[in-house]
Amino acid sequence: DEVRPDGKGNWLNLTSNDFEEFIPIATRETKATKSLTRERAVFKIYSQGVKTNRDEWVCDYSQEALLTKTEHLINRYNEEAKRLRNTASRSNVADLVKYDIKWTRKLKNLLVAGEFLKLDQNCARSSLYRPFVSLHTYFAWELNEDWYQLAQLFPHDVMCNPWISFVEGQRLPFTILAGQELPNYAIFSLDPAQFLTLYRFDEDGNRIDNITDWALKQFQQHYQPGRASTGSARKAKAQPITKEA
């Protein structure tokens, strides 16, 4: 047999080079485009998990304990906001506040803007904090440093949204996980995971399939409905492929 190098110039341990022919699971271009004709990935949007920058204050195994300490955090913030009203600015706020609670850039900016906070018990919700570890998280924009795209994936009346996730960084090898609860930013490590949900939601709360029409068409063309399956004595027709299947 004639030996030829693979597409990467390897003569030994030849590799399969069809990876780039696979359908992308998600891309920045598909995420950003407003045109359906330019979508070229399985999922429309994706997001990192909720980044609180104060897990010790807004995450807990007990919902009651969570609300107690979050209420204390809010009360202390409001006391500082009242004390420093018309005094704090972006340049001096870090030197003026008392550090008996966890201050972050967002919370300092809210204080400078004269904003006061109020506890909302509906913000306490179940979340997947680490693989196979669920906690209660206070999911509120003011007390979470970054939501990324989570407002479109987990609006406040949506407790579960099936997702798959993956991560590949400096601290651990390629890892995948599936779940349905609100995910934490550091679910695997400080290398953030990307979460791809089954659904997304518009500003009015309407549920939209997060799997693109383009991807559905690719699968329908490849796995044609009615094609006889193999691998069993009795052949059965394949079921039509839909986004719900």
Model-identified regions with their sequence ranges:
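Sequence-level detector for compositionally biased, low-complexity segments
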Residues: 1-245
